[in-house]
Amino acid sequence: MVEYNVTSTTLEPKTGWPVVDRLLGGYTELETLNGQVVARCLVAIILCRFIAVWSYNLWFHPLARFPGPFLGRCSLLYRFIHSSRGRIHSAVADAHKKYGDIVRIAPNELSFASVESWKAIYGHPTRGNEIAPKGPFYEVFAAGFNSKCVGSERNPEKHALMRKMLNPAFSQRGLLEQEEIISGTIDKFVHVLGEKAGPGTKGLNMTKWYEMNSFDILGEMAFGESFHSLDTGIPHFWADVVLEHLYIITLLDNLRRIGWLAKLAGLLIPASLVTKNQNSNYSRQQVEKRLGIQKSRNDFVSLLVDKVRAGEVSKEEMTAHVSTITIAGGETVATTLSGLTCFLAQNPDKLERLTKEIRAAFKTFEEINAVKSQQIPYLQAVINEGLRLFPPASGGAPRVSPGFTLHDKYIPKGTEVNVSPWSITHNAKYFSDPWEFKPERWLDPNSKDIKDASRPFLLGPRDCLGRNFALMELNLVLAKLLWSYDMELVNKEINFLEQSTVHVLWWKPGLFVRWHKPQSPGFSPS
């Protein structure tokens, strides 16, 4: 039986055999080791783990031969730091300037910045080459829904079926049939600006008002009812939820690259605090309302409603579709309009030319329509230049390499690949004076600019479904606004590009504008 010396400051065993006592005494000393030693051991183990992983990424990984910033080649820190700050687009552009057209920005991720890369990654497959499927990012984008949608479906065959189902609603013909709904909201928008942002006022924050207009249009088109932001003058809460949702997606897209950390985050973050659930739950409520409308409507989702009622499409799939259409369609168009407003106001000669051409094209406000607006050459040049200078999806569209060769370099299968729109459109190799707002470049037959370097709507079998809708709204809003008013930027010194940040889509600074009725006879829509 072992006795213990209870008078000692530590609990020491006493057996009566000196040798055994010494052995047991040494053992119990381990139990009294302080936490610092244990902590140091854990730190050493973790450090060794990092050194091993970083060494593999730097010298033995299949992408080890590709250049890039040190933190990007060895770890995820480069991506984490710059994406959390909303400046990943700018950091990647700087990396391309230093390292060339192909840059390794994460251990298993390559960024591309060449005209050839657009077709190689997003174009139709040629000569038996497989199509590059969408990347794991889209799994994160679909979070909150129990169904994939046209924006998140990664399987090319399933995506093609979804596109075929939705294409008629977004065709030029389909949209012209819906123009009355779109124009009705825009007319209200133009009227409200004249009332609230005329001479003597502080102006209105057009960053928010363009979002309100776009969301009201999409409320009509996707859910059968406006969000009434233009009526109240207050952004609908869903617009703010969308921006928070996009920030959460940025965070989760980083975490998903470290599997165990993503699982831990899922356990630590209560579902009620994750805005993706607010987004999906509100979408479900709105879809239920839309399905309850019995009167026939000519909008985006009429075909979907019929298919849900026929049992061909689930309500959850319809919900995922309309949520994606609202987020992508609302934010991107509003972003482009905000950028164009700032660029035009800061370049009065461009604004004057555009205004004159619009007012010369239409004698009355009622004459303005989508078809005639899109026949004004300088208006198209202005829109193209705005999309180049401020690409609405500057974060890119990630894909997974099926295994292909580009610029004489083999891109291993399974590599995450992405074209950086910002890097290409701000490269002097493709556009002269890339940081200048020069719509004339799109009209000059002698221009040496490589126009195909700007692909705001992507290309190939998974190009932007809403391209025609976006162009229709951009043309109608600009034509009706500039026909009705002269524009005055209040915060003239704003650096719009520098103050905007990317979290999937753009977070933009306030842009305050006054709208003056022109001296010549005009029209104030009712």
From Swiss-Prot:
Membrane-traversing stretches: 41-61
Cofactor: heme
GO CC annotation terms, alphabetical: membrane
Amino acids binding heme: 464
EC number(s) on file: 1.-.-.-
Keywords: Glycoprotein, Heme, Iron, Membrane, Metal-binding, Monooxygenase, Oxidoreductase, Transmembrane, Transmembrane helix, Virulence
EC primary class: oxidoreductase
GO biological process, one term: biosynthetic process
Pfam families given in the database record: p450
Keyword Oxidoreductase part of the UniProt annotation: yes
Lineage: superkingdom: Eukaryota
Induction: The botrydial biosynthesis cluster genes are co-regulated by the Ca(2+)/calcineurin signal transduction pathway, which is under the control of the alpha subunit BCG1 of a heterotrimeric G protein. Expression of the cluster is also positively regulated by the cluster-specific transcription factor BOT6.
Glycosylated position list: 5, 205, 281
Gene null: resulting phenotype: Abolishes the production of botrydial and accumulates 5-hydroxy-7-(oct-2-enoyl)botrylactone, 6-beta-hydroxy-7-deoxybo-trylactone, cinbotolide B, and cinbotolide C.
A molecular function GO annotation: oxidoreductase activity, acting on paired donors, with incorporation or reduction of molecular oxygen
InterPro entries assigned: Cyt_P450, Cyt_P450_E_grp-I, Cyt_P450_sf, Cytochrome_P450_monoxygenase
Pathway: Secondary metabolite biosynthesis
Its membrane topology: Single-pass membrane protein
Localization annotation: Membrane
Protein purpose: Cytochrome P450 monooxygenase; part of the gene cluster that mediates the biosynthesis of botrydial. Botrydial is necessary for colonization of plant tissue by the T4 strain. It is a strain-dependent virulence factor since highly aggressive strains like SAS56 or B05 still retain substantial virulence when botrydial synthesis is impaired, since they produce also botcinic acid. The first step of botrydial biosynthesis is performed by the sesquiterpene synthase BOT2 which catalyzes the cyclization of farnesyl diphosphate (FPP) to presilphiperfolan-8-beta-ol (PSP).
Similarity field: Belongs to the cytochrome P450 family.
The protein, known as: Cytochrome P450 monooxygenase BOT4
